[in-house]
Amino acid sequence: MHEQYTPRDIEAAAQHFWDEQQSFAVTEQPGKDTYYCLSMFPYPSGKLHMGHVRNYTIGDVIARYQRMLGKNVLQPMGWDAFGMPAENAAMKNNVAPAKWTYENIDYMKTQLKSLGLAIDWAREVTTCKPDYYRWEQWLFTRLFEKGIIYRKNGTVNWDPADQTVLANEQVIDGRGWRSGALIEKREIPMYYFRITDYADELLESLDELPGWPEQVKTMQRNWIGKSRGMEVQFPYDQASIGHEGTLKVFTTRPDTLMGATYVAVAAEHPLATQAAQGNPALQAFIDECKSGSVAEADMATQEKKGMPTSLLVEHPLTGEKLPVWVANYVLMHYGDGAVMAVPAHDERDFEFAHKYNLPVKAVVRTSAGDEVGSEWQAAYGEHGQLINSGEFDGLDFAGAFDAIEAALIRKELGKSRTQFRLRDWGISRQRYWGCPIPIIHCPSCGDVPVPEDQLPVTLPENVVPDGAGSPLARMPEFYECSCPKCGAAAKRETDTMDTFVESSWYFARYASPNYDKGLVDPKAANHWLPVDQYIGGIEHAILHLLYARFFHKLMRDEGLVTSNEPFKNLLTQGMVVAETYYRVASNGGKDWFNPADVEIERDAKAKIIGARLKTDGLPVEIGGTEKMSKSKNNGVDPQSMIEAYGADTCRLFMMFASPPDMSLEWSDSGVEGASRFLRRVWRLAQGHVNQGLPGKLDLAALNDEQKVIRRAIHTAIKQASTDVGQYHKFNTAIAQVMTVMNVLEKAPQSTEQDRALLQEGLEAVTLLLAPITPHISHELWKALGHEQAVIDACWPVVDESALVQDTVTLVVQVNGKLRGQVEMPAAASREEIEAAARNNENVLRFIDGLTIRKVIVVPGKLVNIVAN
């Protein structure tokens, strides 16, 4: 064994061995337990960041541990390669997105390999390659024919300068991020998945996922947003509206119906359109509403504005005339684009009514009383007994719900209804770098799916977009085609799919990535699925994880998979955070400096109290810890860390610094500490191996000191097995290894028996570290005399007999205060323990002259003498 620990050489040798032996290539082995461990695949942005390193290290530790339990483990990797960043980079660098993407993939793949991940690279998928998205198009055509995908007009953010649709996050203060033009809302035809058809199942089957964090399940439940309420119809006032009809609203609070004082409609509602005729001010307000963001989150925070119309509707139960307002907070795509407003019991309506001096009528007795003041109180929204509601007075929420429903049914003006917040998933994107939608528009036949023998519809890769709409719409060579049904001249769809579609089924494709007869080989898919452990950030809690669950059910209903859910267990890893430093610039902005360029001063408790820039020695402001990001310039390049310390040190630090689901604070001293620890392990093993390997340990001949050492080894094995296997607490498992290392370093090495015990200890340390620091473990295992590589070794088994103690130390308290300790045989009786405690020299001093009232013995732990 080399005297020095040289990570670069050790890691290169281990990785070469794994490549040569194809150590991570996996095939189906019927009868052997399978384990599918998957980390969310990366977007090929150019370089790995520390968040990636953490995510993939966590997955790799779990995968390697499960392999050591004897399971057939699948851990694949791929690239979520379509998307806007490639288009933006292409425009900036005047290069085709395909070229930029493939170059990034090549570089990032070498980075991932340098981490020593146990990945089966033969299963790699790249979502922008036709051999992948062809099956997405195939499924699209199947679902279109079944009606699960349909086309309808949708409201989008339209940039009139660039002539393109913008995502909500590309609209900044009402203007296009690139052009600066004022954004308009437009209706354009788009394709939608009927995810609402699966809303009930998506909600109910969350209960089948005990291995998911409650927080994520709650977020999905809220997003799906199932609510039982009432559909209420307000008859048109014919004198003001001019014709018969009813205004439909949906409310979850029908008990407050008698408190409705006005109704509000969305800018797109037919009544708004009618009211604006001959009313330029109202028309201008409607146009303003339509130009706002279409994001629900923005709606929630924006100022509530409205304008009255001359129209009236009738209260369905009292016949009272209620004014119709147009309001910017009413969404056309939720409910029926209209709300009944009860200002006394809804905060939004309350704000609006106070702003525009509309009546407020309390109809529920709340904990705040019967009256409603001029300032909103949370209590006003409570359920309670009805007041000021005529025949319904005195009823509680449930009673009022039923009674008001019965009254509305009698008048044929309402009924109870279940509604979902979840909307159908619009997947059309007016972008170039995405999967082409496989539809042909024929003047005679309408929308015709591309036949299977003409798939894939291939995206031309040699295109440099200019940002002004989709280049596909300006490429006749792409869109000119003939109708598959009638043969007439037709036009190919030029929209591409939302990139969330690719990431909604990739986990299934890994089971048979080269299968060319279908989206998946059902036999292989059902062998591996569902994924046993999925790892990724909490930011994907809703969209990606919901869409993947939805797609899995679509694949099940197509007969491609048999399971109901894609991911059995979910681990949402925390962020990687680091200190930030800045100076305020002359324009009032902030110039951020990388921590590597800053010299810091700490107090006695290691808190940062001052910082200076290394280049000029002048102070910089301390901004606190934040998520590593380019904008705050507080990122650490993983590549430089791997080159300086080795992948094992980086992996060890990442796993030791924090539990996986908590934020991890980057610390250079922590990385140094991890490196120091691995050098200690190497030094101890090297000294041991260089003396020659010992013979077998004679368990029957162990002396007391050796028994204590062996107990420490097996205590570490037992605790680490629980920490890693049950709780993914890698940090406490590593702490166990550090504890046993302290014991082994002090252990005697004078006899053959001592050295055989040290051999057992070093083997345990190597095996416990193997999933976390696989390269050094590969080398140590070989040096400790094993022909079989550590990658094929089993997780260490605890010897329960080693944990049995001949003697135990008990603390002795007098009236609850520690006064001494006694060492007793493990099998000592209660009487023997009590006698020893009473006769302890120090205890005698504290009970002298007192009467002993009671002696409490907690076996194996303590004795408490109660005396006065």
From Swiss-Prot:
Keywords: Aminoacyl-tRNA synthetase, ATP-binding, Cytoplasm, Ligase, Nucleotide-binding, Protein biosynthesis. The gene is leuS. It holds the Pfam family Anticodon_1. One of its GO terms (molecular function) is ATP binding. One of its GO terms (cellular component) is cytosol. Its EC number is 6.1.1.4. A motif ('KMSKS' region) lies at residues 627-631. It comes from Pseudomonas putida (strain W619). CDD domains: Anticodon_Ia_Leu_BEm, LeuRS_core. One of its GO terms (biological process) is leucyl-tRNA aminoacylation. This is Leucine--tRNA ligase.
